[in-house]
């Protein structure tokens, strides 16, 4: 099966993690004016093998509690979040290209069996 190799499992799981990060960044930006709102981010911990034998990128959402930029307690910095969004975009594009390359390699695998 196409997604049975370790590299593809890690890349697709990485895309899931980057998708979660993108949602968190957009959530932060949408709460730019919310009093007391604290920035959330996604932390990538490591690659692990789950109980089903599939490799995944472990990630979790964390709240940045110890910084405050404004008197109302909000700590969202639009410039920082915009930069994170761009960085996330570049990482997603890289993984899309790698996955696309892996998939295109399967076109060149000779088909077994009688003609």
Give the predicted meaning of each segment:
Residues 1-115:
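Amphipathic alpha-helical polymerization modules
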